From Swiss-Prot:
One of its GO terms (cellular component) is mitochondrial inner membrane. Belongs to the COA3 family. Keywords: Membrane, Mitochondrion, Mitochondrion inner membrane, Transmembrane, Transmembrane helix. Required for assembly of cytochrome c oxidase (complex IV). Its main location: mitochondrion. It is a single-pass membrane protein. InterPro entries: Coa3, Coa3_cc. This is Cytochrome c oxidase assembly factor 3, mitochondrial. Residues 65-93 are mitochondrial intermembrane.
Length: 93
C-alpha cells in the first residue's frame, strides 16, 4: 500500500509519537501541557526516592570511615619472605 509523499497520516505513527515532532523529536505544545501538572510531583518523587540510596551510601561511608582496623592482627613477615613476595608481584606484572 503506497501513500502520497505529502500525506500526513497519523495512523501510521505509534500513539506516543504523535506528540513529538517527527523531524526533531521535540515535544509538542500539547505534550508539554499534558505533562505540566506532573512536573513538580515527579521532581519531588525523584528527590525522595533518590535520597534513600544516597542516605544509605553516606551512612555506610561515614561508618566505615571511622573504622581503624587496629583490632586485626598483621602477621609478621620476614625480610626474605617480603623480597620473595615482591619478586612474585613484579613477575606477574
Amino acid at each position: 500500500m503506497k501513500f502520497p509523499a505529502d500525506s500526513n497520516l497519523i495512523l501510521i505513527m505509534p500513539g506516543h509519537a504523535r506528540y513529538r515532532d517527527p523531524k526533531t523529536f521535540e515535544m509538542s505544545p500539547a505534550l508539554v501541557r499534558v505533562r505540566a501538572p506532573y512536573f513538580w510531583r515527579n521532581t519531588l518523587a525523584f528527590i525522595v526516592v533518590g535520597s534513600i540510596p544516597l542516605g544509605v551510601y553516606a551512612y555506610t561511608w561515614s561508618f566505615l570511615n571511622k573504622d581503624e582496623f587496629s583490632d586485626i592482627p598483621i602477621p609478621p613477615v620476614s625480610d626474605e619472605e617480603l623480597a620473595k613476595l615482591k619478586k612474585e608481584y613484579a613477575n606477574k606484572k
